[in-house]
Amino acid sequence: MDIISLGWAGVMTMFTFSLALVVWGRNGF
């Protein structure tokens, strides 16, 4: 795995995690 795919994996993980937090927050979790 090169640094480019590793970086993209990190970005997508953080984006998904933050998006999930926003959804949970709006649902009152």
Curated annotation (Swiss-Prot):
Q: Where are the transmembrane segments?
A: 3-23
Is Cell membrane there in the keyword field? no
Taxonomy, superkingdom: Eukaryota
* Listed GO biological process terms: cytochrome complex assembly; photosynthesis
Q: How does it sit in the membrane?
A: Single-pass membrane protein
Subcellular location, in the record's words? Plastid, Chloroplast thylakoid membrane
Q: Which SUPFAM superfamilies match?
A: PetN subunit of the cytochrome b6f complex
Might you report a single GO cellular component term? cytochrome b6f complex
List the keywords (alphabetical): Chloroplast, Electron transport, Membrane, Photosynthesis, Plastid, Thylakoid, Transmembrane, Transmembrane helix, Transport
Q: Name one Pfam family in it.
A: PetN
Task: Return the InterPro entries for the record.
Answer: Cytochr_b6-f_cplx_su8_sf (IPR036143), Cytochrome_b6-f_cplx_su8 (IPR005497)
GO molecular function per UniProt: electron transporter, transferring electrons within cytochrome b6/f complex of photosystem II activity
Spell out the subunit comment: The 4 large subunits of the cytochrome b6-f complex are cytochrome b6, subunit IV (17 kDa polypeptide, PetD), cytochrome f and the Rieske protein, while the 4 small subunits are PetG, PetL, PetM and PetN. The complex functions as a dimer.
Q: What function does the entry list?
A: Component of the cytochrome b6-f complex, which mediates electron transfer between photosystem II (PSII) and photosystem I (PSI), cyclic electron flow around PSI, and state transitions.
| UniProt record similarity statement | Belongs to the PetN family.
Q: What is this protein called?
A: Cytochrome b6-f complex subunit 8
Organism of origin is Thalassiosira pseudonana (Marine diatom)
> Gene name, please?
petN
